[in-house]
Amino acid sequence: MERPNSSVAGLYSGLHGNGSVENLATEEEGLRLLAGAASARFGSSAGRGGGGGEPEGRPGPFNGIVTEPDPEEGTSSGQRGGINGQRGTKRKMENEGEDFLKELTLSLMSRRHHESVWWADLEDEFKNGEMNLLYKYTFEQLKTHWLEAWEDFELALNTFAKVALRPDTIYTIKKTVNIRKCAYVLGNGAVVRFQTCDRVAFNCAMQSLGPGLIGMSGVTFMNVRFVVEGFNGTVFASTTQLTLHGVFFQNCSGICVDSWGRVSARGCTFVACWKGVVGRNKSQMSVKKCVFERCIMAMVVEGQARIRHNAGSDNVCFLLLKGTASVKHNMICGGGHSQLLTCADGNCQALRVFHVVSHPRRPWPVFEHNMLMRCTVHLGARRGMFSPYQSNFCHTKVLMETDAFSRVWWNGVFDLTMELFKVVRYDESKVRCRPCECGANHIRLYPATLNVTEQLRTDHQMMSCLRTDYESSDED
């Protein structure tokens, strides 16, 4: 893979080698003028062929004439003409979409930037002993390589570090992409598909010692659309710092993100996925402003997590909390239909939309300013007290394990339509074998519950709602 000739001004990778950007724009303008003249000529010739009279129609683009046929109603020819017209309209819309993507790609590739150095040059300076690269160069000065569909994804990332995808191109991953260096991928809304039998698509391993730049840290993917149909593996397996910014995942029957290190998902969308973001033991996970829709398990936390300003809809499990987390300003609506179990604490429990696994030493999660509507919540026993603050449990059922009944505090929540249930015992006569989120099948004992809503609900005759539990400092 050769680098573009940076000594010639106006040349970019992916363009013609002997034509500059200005010449390319001029040629495109000329082609548009020729197309307009041809359309006008076609309209005038059609008018002459109709017996000397001008056809009824409307002015089209490039001063041409778009005729409007009048098929006979109630006849087969009229129906056939309508079907052909629909096909023509659909084909026209597809062509317009392709033309728009091509123009967008040309516009992005033709922009002038203050890029002056390649990543290979930084590596050479680093090997020669230059230790001030962090202050010598910036992200804007690093040259961008526009990736073509036929190029090797792994080789391009390890060679150029800063790689941009073309919006008018569909990329296909046919083998595992091993990333062992600092990498930054600008997706520009490009679509990435998978045709591989490997278990991992992008393996973000521990990085070797190399140059550092302000604005580039670890592995970053931005504005990429992953269509994961037919791929049953893991899209991202990371043991280093991974940042996903505005990434779209759809129809992933495996795991979208499996992290053993630090992972940050910001503004991402997960639609119809098996597992969205999974943080393993001793991992640090940050999920902000993401959307989870119709997922089986949106988030699984085994280490530490910060979950803020997210939205979930029709997920079987929005959060399976095995570790510790801070859950604030989230909106969770509805739950999917499933009979999945979880055996995280050694006991088989039915998987709920918000599920806190019991642990004798780990504290309760911080739960503030959340909106739950028509959800189910499972609370396992933990150390300390669980006190949700300024959260709305609208038409939500909360199931508390036996030891967790005395460790919850429901002051400061909106509890009009909330129902609280306590597990009294497990009925051994009602045994069911259900699939578990770990991949195996387990036997689940049916719990016998007791409604304790009025016992734990705040006595509103004794405590006024005009108190600090329902107010904030920024209110008037």
Swiss-Prot record:
Residues 1-20, 42-95 are annotated as: Disordered. The modification Phosphoserine is found at residues 472-473. It is found in: Host nucleus; Host cytoplasm. It comes from the Viruses. InterPro entries: Adeno_E1B_55K_N, Adeno_E1B_55kDa, Pectin_lyase_fold/virulence. Keywords: Early protein, Host cytoplasm, Host nucleus, Host-virus interaction, Modulation of host cell apoptosis by virus, Phosphoprotein. GO terms for molecular function: ubiquitin-like ligase-substrate adaptor activity. GO terms for biological process: symbiont-mediated perturbation of host apoptosis; symbiont-mediated perturbation of host ubiquitin-like protein modification. One of its GO terms (cellular component) is host cell cytoplasm. Belongs to the adenoviridae E1B 55 kDa protein family. Interacts with host PML-4 and PML-5; this interaction promotes efficient subnuclear targeting of E1B-55K to PML nuclear bodies. Interacts with E4-ORF3 protein. Interacts with E4-ORF6 protein. Plays a major role to prevent cellular inhibition of viral genome replication. Assembles an SCF-like E3 ubiquitin ligase complex based on the cellular proteins ELOB, ELOC, CUL5 and RBX1, in cooperation with viral E4orf6. This viral RING-type ligase ubiquitinates cellular substrates and targets them to proteasomal degradation: TP53/p53, LIG4, MRE11-RAD50-NBS1 (MRN) complex, ITGA3, DAXX and BLM. E1B-55K probably acts as the substrate-specific adapter of the SCF-like E3 ubiquitin ligase complex. Contains a PML interaction motif that allows the subnuclear PML localization. This is E1B 55 kDa protein.
